[in-house]
């Protein structure tokens, strides 16, 4: 019973070893004794097909923006589409325009799988889906007043 449960879990994770089924099919098709070269080629092809490279060489770039008009929202979202991290300072904008800008960027980040987070009042970070911003970083940036624009 434990063996069946393990096989089901392995199958669910895509790690189930279907080699036994393939070996039986080869044996039935030939009606001969074990042909080890065919079995080895099947085993090697199965193993090679499951190898996937998880290493990527993407470098993160950060852009700091202080928009002056709503029209800059599309350009900022294009940067997000190009997988860049954007820090946006909206302190110089009217409240109504800043809200429209944030709504636009929030929708774009949702559509692209990214994230829009507030660092401090009027300062936001827009990050692509491949970047995770921890709360420690936000607290540190806020405490040090690194983005203390005037």
From Swiss-Prot:
The keyword Methyltransferase does not apply. It is found in: Cytoplasm. GO terms for cellular component: cytoplasm. It holds the Pfam family SepF. Keywords: Cell cycle, Cell division, Cytoplasm, Septation. Its main location: cytoplasm. GO terms for biological process: division septum assembly; FtsZ-dependent cytokinesis. The keyword Metal-binding does not apply. Cell division protein that is part of the divisome complex and is recruited early to the Z-ring. Probably stimulates Z-ring formation, perhaps through the cross-linking of FtsZ protofilaments. Its function overlaps with FtsA. Belongs to the SepF family. HAMAP family: SepF. Homodimer. Interacts with FtsZ. This is Cell division protein SepF. The lineage of its organism: Bacteria, Bacillati, Bacillota, Clostridia, Eubacteriales.
